[in-house]
Structure formats: structure tokens, C-alpha cells
């Protein structure tokens, strides 16, 4: 009996592992409309690669690499979660909340936002000088991040 239960558990585990396989595409058409709109409104570069992350056959996330090296992650509905650009560019203004942009301009003149992560509690911003900042959802500065 133990062998049967073990075999069933192994088969079930293999099924879940197989259904979690990520897929890749070289075309923006696999992205939700919201993600395609975000890219076209904020970036000049074209989509190079789209990684579609799945768990148990369900899409969890889209990771997009653009031809200029920028990387953007979107949730299954096409809402962006984070974005990074190469160190010679800046994250597009459409990704940076007004309060965040104003704080960076006032307190870190001469730097650029090269990375931004969005989560339930707010934003984490990486500057071109390597400093990381935390902001709440309204764009108010909270602290420097380690």
C-alpha cells in the first residue's frame, strides 16, 4: 500500500513539475493588451524575448526583455511589477510616480532611476549611483534600503 501511495505521489509531483514549464516567445502578441500598451507608450525599443512563467498550467508572470536590454515584468493581467534599464538610460517617466520623481530630482540631483519594483506596500527604486530608496504607494519617501 505504501508503494502505491508513493508511486501516486511521485506521478502527481511529476505532473505538477511538467505543467510548470516556462515558455518563450519573440513576439509581443503573446502579452496581454495592457502589457503591450505599457511597452509601446513608454519604450522605443522592441520586444526581444518574452518568458511566460507558469505554475500548474496557469500563467503567473511575463518577463520581457527589450532590444535595448531593458527588462520589464508583468503579472498575468498585464500590470507591470518591475522595470530595469541599462545604466545609460532611465526608467521611463510613466513608470515613476510623481512623488518619487520629485524626491529623486530634489534629493539626488544628477542621478537617474534605473530600476523600479512595485508591490502592495509601495515602490523600491534603484538609482544610477547604486542607492536604493523605498516609497509608499502614494510616492512618499520612507527610507533608504540596504
Please annotate each region the language model reported.
Residues 47-72, 117-133:
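Exposed beta-strand-loop-beta-strand "reactive/processing" segments of non-cytosolic proteins
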Amino acid at each position: 500500500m505504501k508503494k502505491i501511495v508513493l508511486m501516486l505521489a511521485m506521478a502527481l509531483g511529476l505532473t505538477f513539475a511538467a505543467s510548470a514549464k516556462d515558455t518563450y516567445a519573440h513576439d509581443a502578441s503573446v502579452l496581454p493588451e495592457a502589457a503591450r500598451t505599457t511597452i509601446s507608450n513608454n519604450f522605443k525599443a522592441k520586444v526581444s524575448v518574452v518568458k511566460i512563467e507558469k505554475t500548474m498550467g496557469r500563467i503567473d508572470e511575463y518577463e520581457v526583455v527589450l532590444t535595448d536590454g531593458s527588462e520589464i515584468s508583468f503579472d498575468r493581467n498585464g500590470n507591470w511589477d518591475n522595470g530595469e534599464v541599462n545604466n545609460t538610460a532611465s526608467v521611463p517617466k510613466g513608470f515613476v510616480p510623481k512623488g518619487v520623481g520629485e524626491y529623486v530630482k530634489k534629493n539626488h540631483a544628477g542621478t537617474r532611476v534605473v530600476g523600479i519594483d512595485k508591490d502592495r506596500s509601495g515602490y523600491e527604486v534603484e538609482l544610477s549611483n547604486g542607492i536604493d530608496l523605498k516609497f509608499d504607494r502614494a510616492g512618499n519617501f520612507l527610507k533608504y534600503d540596504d
